[in-house]
Swiss-Prot record:
Involved pathway(s): Amino-acid biosynthesis; L-isoleucine biosynthesis; L-isoleucine from 2-oxobutanoate: step 2/4; Amino-acid biosynthesis; L-valine biosynthesis; L-valine from pyruvate: step 2/4
Co-factor binding comment: Binds 2 magnesium ions per subunit.
Name of the protein in its database record: Ketol-acid reductoisomerase (NADP(+))
The protein's Enzyme Commission number: 1.1.1.86
Organism for this UniProt entry: Methanosphaera stadtmanae (strain ATCC 43021 / DSM 3091 / JCM 11832 / MCB-3)
Residues that, per the record, bind NADP(+): Y24, G25, S26, Q27, R47, S52, D82, E83, I84, Q85, G133
Role this protein plays: Involved in the biosynthesis of branched-chain amino acids (BCAA). Catalyzes an alkyl-migration followed by a ketol-acid reduction of (S)-2-acetolactate (S2AL) to yield (R)-2,3-dihydroxy-isovalerate. In the isomerase reaction, S2AL is rearranged via a Mg-dependent methyl migration to produce 3-hydroxy-3-methyl-2-ketobutyrate (HMKB). In the reductase reaction, this 2-ketoacid undergoes a metal-dependent reduction by NADPH to yield (R)-2,3-dihydroxy-isovalerate.
Annotated positions binding substrate: S251
Domain KARI N-terminal Rossmann residues, every copy: 1-181
Keyword terms: Amino-acid biosynthesis, Branched-chain amino acid biosynthesis, Magnesium, Metal-binding, NADP, Oxidoreductase
Pfam families in alphabetical order: KARI_C (PF01450), KARI_N (PF07991)
Length: 330
């Protein structure tokens, strides 16, 4: 695996290009400001008059409607939520895309699942920071950066790679290291990580552990500390130096118990279910399910969101964080 750094970027193809960043959420703001501060010609495309419009102007950026920004740009970097990208692209962007332009994303979802179809005479690239937009901005301002990915789905002009790696450098990604991937690999692994581990598996594991202790008669506050609050301590150890570092830093009791009991929690059946989740991502089942929910005003998502908010662990956690000074009382 080759990791690309600042010294590996030796081209200057963006010098006379205009980059329109569509959206000014977490990634939109972080990437726009970093590219602007790196000397690139950046404009932001937004809905006129919204909160983001004013914020981008206050940040010193040139702001235009999505249509006007797309019309003016050589590179259109789409950073609005996945579920609205297709509609915005079809209604406000695609009529202004010209041969030789570049359409760029930070997640491959809509290209990989063919929800957005770009003409063959247009580049399709990706620059994907592996951090939230606020962290992308913070580390850039500190003189460093965050790791990231680049991918080329369509190279119509012969210099799509140079465009992507230069954008990655301007965002600050090559300061930390960039890996080249594909739209398929980025999309499928990203969705799997979210569903089976980071957002789905981990939260399910924490909640099941909490409920097990409470149902056995232990105080909910103790259950929260032991199954949720301390999770950050363990994750930080793994993040910094890997699993070996974590095992080294915990007690022998914790290490022995963890290594001899974990296979009874995450079983072969768990792994088979992970494989099923991956297949549903690969064959488009998940993308279809999400699109149907989005197109009908999110009945499934809103129900799940409400149920999550009603869980005991949420109420206990909030009260503890406020009591310990970790969260301000609303």
């Amino acid at each position: 695996m080759k990791v690309l750094y600042d010294d590996d970027v030796n081209t200057n193809v963006l010098e006379n290009k205009t980059i329109a960043v569509i959206g000014y959420g977490s990634q939109g703001r972080g990437q726009s400001l970093n590219m602007h501060d790196s000397g690139l010609n950046v404009i932001v495309g937004l809905r006129e008059g919204g909160k983001s419009w004013k914020k981008a102007q206050e940040d010193g950026l040139t702001v235009k409607t999505i249509e006007d920004a797309s019309k003016e740009a050589d590179i259109i970097h789409i950073l609005i939520p996945d579920e609205i990208q297709k509609t915005v692209y079809e209604n406000q962007i695609q009529q202004y895309v010209e041969p030789g332009n570049t359409i760029s994303f930070s997640h491959g979802y809509n290209i990989h699942f063919n929800r957005i179809r770009v003409p063959e005479d247009v580049n399709v690239t990706m620059i994907a920071p592996k951090a939230p937009g606020s962290k992308v901005r913070q580390t850039y301002q500190e003189g460093f950066g965050t790791p990231g990915l680049i991918a080329i789905e369509q190279d119509a002009t012969g210099d799509a790679y140079d465009i992507a790696i230069e954008m990655a450098k301007a965002v600050g990604l090559t300061r930390a290291g960039v890996i080249e991937t594909t739209y398929r690999e980025e999309t499928e692994t990203d969705l799997f990580g979210e569903q089976a581990v980071l957002c789905g598996g981990l939260t399910g594991l924490i909640q099941a552990g909490f409920e097990t202790l409470v149902e056995a008669g232990y105080k909910p506050e103790m259950a929260y500390f032991e199954t949720c609050h301390e999770m950050k301590l363990i994750v930080d150890l793994i993040y910094e130096k890997g699993f070996g570092n974590m095992w080294h830093d915990v007690s022998n009791t914790a290490e022995f118990g963890g290594l001899t009991r974990r296979d009874r929690v995450i079983t072969e059946e768990s792994k088979e279910n992970m494989k099923k989740i991956l297949r549903e991502i690969q064959d488009g089942t998940f993308a279809t399910e999400f699109a149907v929910d989005a197109d009908t005003s999110y009945p499934k998502l809103l129900t799940q969101r409400r149920l999550e908010g009603e869980k005991q662990i949420e109420k206990v956690g909030k009260n503890l964080r406020i009591a310990c000074g970790l969260q301000k009382e609303e």
